[in-house]
UniProtKB/Swiss-Prot annotation:
Residues 254-415 form the W2 domain. PROSITE patterns: W2. The lineage of its organism: Eukaryota, Metazoa, Ecdysozoa, Arthropoda, Hexapoda. This is Eukaryotic translation initiation factor 5. Residues 145-203, 409-464 are annotated as: Disordered. It comes from Drosophila melanogaster (Fruit fly). Disulfide bonds: none annotated. The gene is eIF5. Gene3D superfamilies: 1.25.40.180, 2.20.25.350, 3.30.30.170. Catalyzes the hydrolysis of GTP bound to the 40S ribosomal initiation complex (40S.mRNA.Met-tRNA[F].eIF-2.GTP) with the subsequent joining of a 60S ribosomal subunit resulting in the release of eIF-2 and the guanine nucleotide. The subsequent joining of a 60S ribosomal subunit results in the formation of a functional 80S initiation complex (80S.mRNA.Met-tRNA[F]). Belongs to the eIF-2-beta/eIF-5 family. The modification Phosphoserine is found at S9, S412, S413, S415. GTP binds at G28, K29, G30, N31, G32, I33, K34, T35. GO terms for cellular component: cytosol.
Length: 464
């Protein structure tokens, strides 16, 4: 089997850390098509990670569901995927979750703290130990399925481990009771009277001695339980810095995009109802939440739905600072904002359809939408956000402003060309004058003086 370096940035053929080249096979057709990772188990053993981790990483990166069958060592990613692309994704996983950040060696272990919901990485080669700095959707999966967990339980839940511990405890209790019964039978053959009572009291005494009494200290420890309600979590997030908020691990990563958009929708709606959207701190909080939910580009679509009414002109002017936080230097977010504007126009068609050109000009004048984004949008009628008829009508109403933009662009380009031509002519004239001056200097005398010398030469000839 062909092998490659675990760290593929190392080209040394004698590099000691090798792994099998990933093999994939596409099975099925239509909606049931899937990519089977044939040798994922061998690859996982070579890099020292459970096979579920890179498989889940593929699913997060490709937006596909994953299936695990530990008994048959079968790992599947839904959809048809090229093996070379999967190998590149595997390199990304190794870079983020396997290689040591200090020495780049793959001799590392991951340790999960279920209490703190953190992942630590330790290196056997250089001794490095620290928190994993990578913030990825697969982090949540790793926290729920730590490396120390039985591989067959990974991908399901921790309940199996708890269930096995309870079963073991039950078996131990059963063994203990059987031992006590045998002791009672052995000693109980002599007498059935007071001896039985003494044996029962003796057994109770042994059980009481085995179970430690509760102390005040134990009661104090029980009072330190963590409140995991939504209000408590939101309060703790408020105490974090902006950078730490983006690094927190949340179960929201496992939710679909629609569910994450709904979470952001409810947050914006709550801030709007409480009239907090004028606060700069609220703007920062919304941006951080959108980044955490990985919907920063689609957030303007939510803002348009909640903030724009039939008085969209005033709404845009009022909420310009908030809109700029999402659309500034972000063409994708601007395109989704245009989609939100289209939906608003469709909702208030009788009032806003005739004002479309002015609405787009307002967005342009306030620097919320860039010229290039508007011109790109105008090239094609799309029914992504509204019906095709409404989209075509909006494009038609916006055409005067689009033509104005195009003409302004052409005029600016023509004026720039004219300025360039004039500057070239000026440079040519000045250079010609300089060249003429140089010729006079080279002759060493002004033109009039040269004429006088010619006259003097004529006189001298006549005299001769």
């Amino acid at each position: 089997m062909a092998t490659v370096n675990v760290n593929r940035s190392v080209t040394d053929i004698f590099y000691r850390y090798k792994m099998p080249r990933l093999q994939a096979k596409v099975e099925g057709k239509g909606n049931g098509i899937k990519t089977v990772l044939v040798n994922m188990a061998e690859v996982a053993r070579a890099i020292g990670r459970p096979a579920t981790y890179p498989t889940k990483y593929f699913g997060c990166e490709l937006g596909a569901q994953t299936l695990f069958d530990h008994k048959n060592e079968r790992f599947v990613v839904n959809g048809s995927h090229d093996v070379n692309k999967l190998q590149d994704l595997l390199d990304g996983f190794i870079r983020k979750f396997v290689l040591c950040p200090e020495c780049d060696n793959p001799e590392t272990n991951l340790t999960v703290s279920a209490k703190n919901q953190t992942i630590s990485q330790s290196c056997k080669a250089c001794g490095f130990h620290g928190l994993l700095k990578v913030n990825h959707k697969v982090n949540t999966f790793i926290v729920k399925n730590p490396p120390s967990l039985n591989p067959a339980a990974q991908g399901s839940s921790l309940t199996e481990g708890k269930r096995s511990r309870k079963q073991k405890q039950k078996n131990d209790n059963a063994d203990g009771s059987m031992t006590n019964n045998s002791l009672a039978n052995n000693s109980g053959g002599e007498s059935d009277g007071g001896n039985g009572t003494n044996q029962a009291s003796q057994t109770e005494a042994e059980i009481s001695a085995a179970i430690p009494e509760k102390t005040a200290k134990d009661d104090d420890d029980e009072g330190w339980s963590v409140d995991v309600s939504k209000e408590a979590i939101r309060a703790r997030l408020q105490d974090l810095t902006d950078g730490a908020k983006g690094m927190t691990i949340s179960d929201d990563y496992d939710k679909t995009e629609k569910e994450r958009i709904d979470i952001f929708y409810e947050l914006v709606k709550d801030k709007r109802d409480k009239k907090q959207l004028d606060d700069v701190q609220t703007h920062k909080e919304l941006v951080i939440e959108a980044e955490r939910l990985d919907i920063i580009n689609k957030a303007p679509l939510v803002l348009a739905e909640l903030l724009f009414t039939e008085n969209i002109i005033k709404d845009v002017q009022k909420n310009r600072p908030l809109l700029l936080r999402f659309t500034l230097n972000n063409p994708k977010a601007q395109r989704y904002l245009i989609g939100g504007v289209e939906q608003t126009v469709e909702l208030h068609k009788g009032i806003l359809m005739s004002k479309v050109a002015g609405i787009f000009k307002l967005f342009y004048d306030l620097d919320i939408l860039d010229e290039a984004v508007i011109l790109e949008w105008a090239q094609k009628v799309s029914k992504r956000h509204v019906s095709k008829n409404i989209a075509a009508e909006i494009h038609e109403k916006a055409m005067p402003f689009v033509l104005w933009l195009k003409n302004a662009e052409e005029e600016s380009s023509e004026s720039e060309e004219e300025e360039d031509d004039e500057s070239e002519e000026d440079n040519y004239v000045s250079s010609a004058g300089q060249r003429g001056g140089q010729r006079v200097v080279q002759r060493g005398i002004p033109r009039a003086v040269a004429g006088d010398e010619d006259d003097e030469d004529d006189v001298n000839i006549d005299d001769i």
